[in-house]
A protein has these predicted regions:
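Short, intrinsically disordered, charge-biased short linear motifs at domain edges
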Residues: 39-46, 71-72, 126-130, 159-177
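Active-site recognition of the HExxH zinc-binding catalytic motif
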Residues: 118, 122-141, 145
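Extracellular/mature segments of secreted proteins
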Residues: 62-70, 94-96, 109-119, 152, ...
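Substrate-binding clefts and substrate-entry loops adjacent to catalytic sites
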Residues: 106-108, 125-127, 131, 153
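Surface-exposed patches in mature extracellular/periplasmic domains of secreted proteins
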Residues: 51-56, 133-139, 153-165
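Long, well-structured alpha-helical subdomains associated
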Residues: 153-202
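A metal-dependent hydrolase signature that marks the N-terminal structural subdomain at the beginning
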Residues: 2-109
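Acidic helix-start/capping segments at beta-turn-to-alpha-helix junctions
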Residues: 54-64, 145, 160-170
Length: 202
């Protein structure tokens, strides 16, 4: 599951902290096209599975951005993303990207459009790691934050834009320590570093 912890985010459909409930996956892998296929391919690349897909639909609660069902220790084959998440990612895929000038030093706080994109891209990455078998929320969160740039680039963002979004996301949408989504190992060289041989972070 992908939580929201930034109090400043005022969009109703993206507000509040996410609970621990999971929605049920539907059997089979649907045949998607266009944007839906792009989401599937991101999930497949990150999870390392060819049999997974992403569905956009209403979650059990408006505060839940995404879910993956686990059957014992095994993940299902579908990630469910909330409609606001999918709408934001679709805009990115269509080339309607918000300016990231606000992420530069001295430019002040970014607007809701940038925050929404940061949450949405990291939510897809987070749930994709769940599809890959990562059940621990703190690990999925750390891996997802490190993969936000990958998600953005796969959804047609230029590499420089994607990297900037990834850096902004890591430092601005990280959860606090008391919700189960934070790990002290989520840092350069930590045990959750996806690329320990690289000095780049995230």
């Amino acid at each position: 599951m992908r939580p929201i912890f930034i109090v400043a985010l005022s969009v109703a459909l993206l507000g509040g902290a996410v609970d621990a409930r999971h929605a049920f996956s539907r059997p089979g892998t649907p045949r998607h096209h266009g944007f839906a296929l792009a989401l599937d391919r991101v999930a497949q690349e990150i999870s390392g599975r060819r049999d997974v897909s992403v569905r956009c639909g209403t979650t059990a609660d408006p505060s839940i951005l995404g879910t993956v069902t686990f059957y014992g220790a095994s993940p299902g084959r579908e990630a469910l993303l909330a409609p606001p998440v999918c709408s934001t990612l679709r805009r990115l895929w269509e080339g309607r990207r918000p300016s990231l000038a606000c992420t530069g030093l001295g430019h002040g706080q970014c607007g809701q459009d940038v925050l929404e994109l940061a949450w949405a891209a990291s939510a897809l990455a987070h749930e994709s790691y769940h599809l890959g078998g990562v059940r621990n929320e703190a690990a999925a969160e750390c891996y997802g934050l490190q993969s936000t740039a990958l998600v953005a680039e796969r959804l047609h963002a230029p590499p420089a834009y994607a990297d900037r979004l990834g850096t902004y996301t890591f430092w601005n949408v990280r959860p606090p320590v008391d919700y189960g989504y934070f790990s002290p190992e989520c840092h350069d060289g930590g045990s959750l570093d996806l690329h320990p041989a690289s000095a780049e972070w995230p």
